Amino acid sequence: MTFDPAALGWRAMRTNPMPSSIGLPWAKRTDNNWQYAFLTTNEHANPQGAVHGGILMTFADHTLGIYAWEAAQRAPCVTIQMNTHFLAAVTPGDFVELRGEVTRATRGLVFVRGILAVGDKDVAAIDGIWRVLRARPTG
């Protein structure tokens, strides 16, 4: 039987080509917040057979950046620091979900943290800082 995120209330996200290269991202609104997810495949595996940590970090960077972007009133943001603590291995075929939150936002910086999970199992804890890019006055 094939896993279908849409059957669980997830909807496919439109995104730019870079994050979609790791797979179609999914989004779901819960408790006045968004969650994001992607379905891992054999192409994401490292030589040991687990999903490569870089794949998980790329997904976390992109989706936590969405939280920062929303907190910055949709002004462009760039990652200036991101810390990842791996807690458990992810197996190809796992559906990886990210739950995130903005912990602080200033005019120029947004602080975000999140948990990557497979079902009830936390697999990584991430925190980071995003710089808000604002147009500079000309003249």
Identify the meaning behind each predicted range.
Residues 1-139:
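Terminal targeting signals and extreme-terminal segments of soluble enzymes
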